[in-house]
């Protein structure tokens, strides 16, 4: 049976460090390091993943690549007024994933657009790159698109900040079901002091 073009792309991205994709990624990262933290791009790097998440090559749909530095939370030592237990600086993790941070930064950069979803495209020793799919809710092409016009409704404002994107829902634990997920819905803080 003949395989689709997208299946070949997906297969290559399962191991981006091997084969022809590895050399291509090596060249890309050299260019990406010289660019800014948030860059608008013409077309997605991973076409299969972008299409899977709702991307369409049409007006009103924008892709931005965002670089976020790796590692735990950067925290400064307090100058006064903490007991030793609360003075922690090192070994503190983030409460949000790097992917979610990337979505929020893109949403702040483009306040008139709405975040649809995002996906990983690469990383090196010091940073990770994600591509964010952004939608213009005022564009006529989006308002007339039956697959995307739901995002034009005002209830979808600030999706990235409210944890409603794919990275946000994953970060909130909403992909887990059954035992151990009793306190994740509707949110980790609702009804109990226990979180995820």
UniProtKB/Swiss-Prot annotation:
Protein name stated in the entry: Large ribosomal subunit protein eL15
Membership in a protein family: Belongs to the eukaryotic ribosomal protein eL15 family.
One GO BP annotation of this record: cytoplasmic translation
Record-level Gene Ontology MF annotations: RNA binding; structural constituent of ribosome
Origin species: Haloquadratum walsbyi (strain DSM 16790 / HBSQ001)
PROSITE patterns xrefs: RIBOSOMAL_L15E (PS01194)
Keyword Ribosomal protein found: yes
Keywords associated with the record: Ribonucleoprotein, Ribosomal protein
Alphabetical list of Pfam families matching this protein: Ribosomal_L15e (PF00827)
InterPro entries: Rbsml_eL15_core_dom_sf, Ribosomal_eL15, Ribosomal_eL15_arc, Ribosomal_eL15_CS, Ribosomal_uL23/eL15/eS24_sf
């Amino acid at each position: 049976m003949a395989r689709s073009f997208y299946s070949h792309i997906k297969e290559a991205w399962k191991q981006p460090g091997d084969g022809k994709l590895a050399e291509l990624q090596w060249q890309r990262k050299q260019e990406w390091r010289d660019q800014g933290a948030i860059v608008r791009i013409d077309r997605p790097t991973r076409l299969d993943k972008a299409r899977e998440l709702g991307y369409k090559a049409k007006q009103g749909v924008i892709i931005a690549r965002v670089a976020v530095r790796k590692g735990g939370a950067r925290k400064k030592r307090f100058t006064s007024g903490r007991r030793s237990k609360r003075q922690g600086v090192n070994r503190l993790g983030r409460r949000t994933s790097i992917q979610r941070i990337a979505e929020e930064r893109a949403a702040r950069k483009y306040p008139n657009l709405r975040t649809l979803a995002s996906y990983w495209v690469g990383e090196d020793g010091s940073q990770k790159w994600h591509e964010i799919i952004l939608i213009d809710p005022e564009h006529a092409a989006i308002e007339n698109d039956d697959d995307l016009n739901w995002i034009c409704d005002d209830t979808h404002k600030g999706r990235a900040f409210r944890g409603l994107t794919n990275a946000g829902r994953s970060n909130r634990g909403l992909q887990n079901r059954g035992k151990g997920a009793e306190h994740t819905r509707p949110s980790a803080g609702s009804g109990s002091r226990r979180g995820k």
